[in-house]
């Protein structure tokens, strides 16, 4: 199946938080869709270069409204689009157990999304 991936990140974030957001989204994507990570490669002196993604992942600028709207639209197609989000609640936590506990008490409307990653069929992305 022909698949595509995009990330949309809030353009109003500081550069460091934009970089952090894309790193977290990419790591989660690699875990969930391991086949997109290529094999290790070697240069002419046999130095190893670890496998990187085998697909393009364009990163687009958006804002909180656009990210929320795209998230809403993508969630209509759960069998065709994998949605990964990163929000203020996650960024504020010291560890993953704190994230789990806080998320259980949060409403979706209370979250400020920093970025989303959409991976799915070309017709839906």
Please name every model-derived segment.
Residues 1-125:
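Positively charged, small/polar-rich N-terminal and surface patches that mediate targeting and assembly
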């Amino acid at each position: 199946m022909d698949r595509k991936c995009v990330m949309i990140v809030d353009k109003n974030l500081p550069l460091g938080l934009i970089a952090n957001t894309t790193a977290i989204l990419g790591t989660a994507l690699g875990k969930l869709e391991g086949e997109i990570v290529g094999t290790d490669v070697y240069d002419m002196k046999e130095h190893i270069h670890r496998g990187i993604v085998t697909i393009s992942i364009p990163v687009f600028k958006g804002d909180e409204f656009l990210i929320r709207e795209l998230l809403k639209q993508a969630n209509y197609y759960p069998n065709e689009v994998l949605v990964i989000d990163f929000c203020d609640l996650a960024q504020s936590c010291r560890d993953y157990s704190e994230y789990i506990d806080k998320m259980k008490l949060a409403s979706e409307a209370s979250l400020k999304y920093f970025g989303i990653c959409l991976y799915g069929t070309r017709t839906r992305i």
